[in-house]
Amino acid sequence: KMQEGKLDGVFLAAFIGQGKRDEASLQEAVQKVTGLIEGIRKQAELNKDLCGIAVTNQDFIRLKNEGKKAFFIGIENGYGIGKDLANIAKFKAMGVNYITLCHSYDNDICDSSTHTKKEWDGLSPFGEEVVKEMNRQGIMVDMSHASEKSFWDVIKLSKAPIICSHSSSMAMCKHDRNLTDEQLKALAQNGGVAQVCLLDRYINEDYKNASLTDA
């Protein structure tokens, strides 16, 4: 499909839904994400004549010149790092380029844009340490799914540009998952990027009639 679509590289996300936040559940989350990343790496190795893992833009260019597809790795939901900052370095060593801080519910890092109880009023104290460590490790901070307050907290704290990997425009479609004009402008000034999410309800409030023209 990548060949047919003339796509040279993709980000593959090790996704984990939000679960319980007791110690046992957090350890299980870390193990699940570790397994997903190992699975991506294994598939790349099994098909090394066709693709490879990319961590840098130089890796991407090398793979393209070799006629291979590039697989970048991300983690969707910081729940997957548990409460141990050392896991950030561990995942960096496994090739992770970005981590989405939360998903559809609040976690130990920050408040979500959906189903939120505004537990932290934005970024938590632990979340501040997570962002600092991600900056130190060279992992992009992804604020898709996070609450607007979480976004502002992170963009002020981060020493590196942040991203919103799959968020659309609030001005075009009112949904808590989308970004306001103020957020988009701040993101541009920060040197970061936002990628449009094509989920029907994020691009058309009458989502049952959404189409690609809405994007």
Q: Can you annotate each of these PLM segments?
A:
Residues 125-215:
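Catalytic pocket-lining loop regions of alpha/beta-barrel enzymes
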Residues 1-118, 174-215:
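N-terminal hydrophobic targeting/anchoring segments and the immediately downstream early-domain regions
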Residues 94-148:
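Metal-dependent enolase-superfamily TIM-barrel catalytic cores that perform enediolate-based chemistry
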